[in-house]
C-alpha cells in the first residue's frame, strides 16, 4: 500500500466541510468567488479520498467474511476471489491521490510569457527561433489558447533574433514551464554546398504571467526612460519618442519595448517586468522546496541544454529525461504532448521520492 499523509488528508476534509458550509451562508460575491475557486480545487482530492474510504470499507467487509468460520464456504470463496481486484483498485486510487496531494506550483494555472532568443549560429539560430515559435504557436492553438506577440526582432534571412509573446489560457504555464532552457538544432543549412551539418541554438524562457495582485511594483522602485524607436537598420520609424525602457532599480532588471505606441510600450514593458519579478520569487520558493531533489525537470534553468532537434535523423532528444522520439516533423508542427507529459511524470516522480525521504 502507498504511504499517504493522513494528517494532511484530515485537514483537507475539514477545510472542505468549512467551505461547503460557508458557501451556503450567502457570502458576498467576492468571498463566494474565492470559496468557489478553492472548492473546485479541493473537489477532485476529496472525491478521491471518499472513493478510497469506500474501497477500504469493502475490503474490511470481505476480510470479515473470509475470516468468519460460520459463514458459508462458497461465500468465503467468492469474497476471496473478489479481494485481489479491490486491492488493485485501492493501489491505483492511492497513487492518483498521492499525485493530487503533491505540492502545487502557485503559477501552474496562469497564462505564460514566452521569450525566444537566437543563440550561437547566426542566421541559422534566428531561423531556428522562428521554428520554435511556430511550434509553440501550433501547440497553443491545438489547446485553444490565445497567442499574442508582444515584440519581435526579425532575423536577416528569416526567423527571429528575439520574439516575445503571451500565451493565454487556463493552465498554460503548467505545461510550457518545462520548455525553459537551451534548445539545440542540428541540420544542413540551405546555403551549405558541402552538405555539412551545422549546430545552432536558441534560448527559451517561459514566465508565468503575473497580475498586479501577485507582484507589487512600487513607483519609486522603477525608472522609466523614453527614446526614439528604430526600425530595421536603425532608421527612425516615427518622429516621437515612443520606445520605453523600464529599469527595476532593486534588481537591475531592464525591459525595453519599441513599438509605435508609447502607452502600449509602457503597459507591455510593465507586464514583462512583473512576470520576471514574479518568476524570481517563484524560483526562490521552488529552489528551497527542491534543494534535495536531483531532477532538473521544471527547474527553469535557462542555461541548461534541454533538447536537441536533429534534422538528418528526424530525431528529437530531451536530455533531462533521456527521451528520444523519431517524429521531428510532428513535434515542430506542435505535437508536444508526449514530451510534456513525460516531463510532468518525471517531475511528479521526483516530488514523490522527496516526500518519501521526508
Curated annotation (Swiss-Prot):
Identification of the protein by name: Peptide chain release factor 1
Location of N5-methylglutamine modifications: 235
Protein role: Peptide chain release factor 1 directs the termination of translation in response to the peptide chain termination codons UAG and UAA.
Source species, domain of life: Bacteria
Predominant location category: cytoplasm
UniProt PTM comment: Methylated by PrmC. Methylation increases the termination efficiency of RF1.
Annotated region described as Disordered, given as residue ranges: 284-309
Subcellular location: Cytoplasm
Family per similarity comment: Belongs to the prokaryotic/mitochondrial release factor family.
Annotated source species: Bartonella tribocorum (strain CIP 105476 / IBS 506)
Amino acid at each position: 500500500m502507498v504511504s499517504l499523509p493522513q494528517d494532511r488528508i484530515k485537514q483537507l476534509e475539514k477545510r472542505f466541510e468549512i467551505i461547503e458550509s460557508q458557501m451556503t451562508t450567502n457570502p458576498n460575491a467576492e468571498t463566494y468567488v474565492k470559496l468557489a475557486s478553492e472548492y473546485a480545487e479541493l473537489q477532485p482530492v476529496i472525491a478521491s479520498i471518499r472513493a478510497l474510504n469506500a474501497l477500504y470499507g469493502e475490503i474490511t467487509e470481505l476480510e470479515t467474511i473470509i475470516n468468519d468460520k460460520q459463514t458459508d464456504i462458497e461465500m468465503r470463496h467468492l469474497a476471496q476471489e473478489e479481494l485481489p481486484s479491490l486491492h488493485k483498485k485501492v493501489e491505483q486510487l492511492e497513487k492518483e491521490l498521492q499525485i493530487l496531494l503533491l505540492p502545487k506550483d502557485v503559477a501552474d494555472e496562469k497564462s505564460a510569457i514566452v521569450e525566444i532568443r537566437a543563440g550561437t549560429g547566426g542566421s541559422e539560430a534566428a531561423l531556428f527561433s522562428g521554428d520554435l515559435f511556430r511550434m509553440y504557436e501550433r501547440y497553443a492553438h491545438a489547446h485553444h489558447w490565445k497567442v499574442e506577440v508582444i515584440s519581435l526582432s526579425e532575423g536577416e534571412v528569416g526567423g527571429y533574433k528575439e520574439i516575445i509573446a503571451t500565451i493565454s489560457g487556463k493552465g498554460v504555464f503548467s505545461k510550457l514551464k518545462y520548455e525553459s532552457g537551451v534548445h539545440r538544432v542540428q541540420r544542413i543549412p540551405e546555403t551549405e554546398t558541402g552538405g555539412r551539418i551545422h549546430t545552432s541554438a536558441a534560448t527559451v524562457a517561459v514566465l508565468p504571467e503575473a497580475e498586479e495582485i501577485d507582484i507589487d511594483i512600487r513607483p519609486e522602485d522603477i525608472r522609466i526612460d523614453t527614446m526614439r524607436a528604430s526600425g530595421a537598420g536603425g532608421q527612425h520609424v516615427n518622429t516621437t519618442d515612443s520606445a520605453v525602457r523600464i529599469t527595476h532599480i532593486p534588481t537591475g532588471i531592464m525591459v525595453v519595448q519599441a513599438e509605435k505606441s508609447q502607452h502600449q510600450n509602457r503597459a507591455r514593458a510593465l507586464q514583462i517586468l512583473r512576470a520576471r519579478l514574479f518568476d524570481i520569487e517563484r524560483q526562490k520558493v521552488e529552489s528551497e522546496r527542491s534543494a534535495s531533489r536531483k531532477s532538473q525537470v521544471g527547474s527553469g534553468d535557462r542555461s541548461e541544454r534541454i533538447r536537441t532537434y536533429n534534422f538528418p535523423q528526424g530525431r528529437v532528444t530531451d536530455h533531462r529525461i533521456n527521451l528520444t522520439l523519431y517524429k521531428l516533423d510532428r513535434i515542430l508542427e506542435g505535437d508536444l504532448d508526449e514530451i510534456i507529459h513525460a516531463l510532468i511524470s518525471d517531475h511528479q516522480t521526483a516530488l514523490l521520492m522527496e516526500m518519501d525521504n521526508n
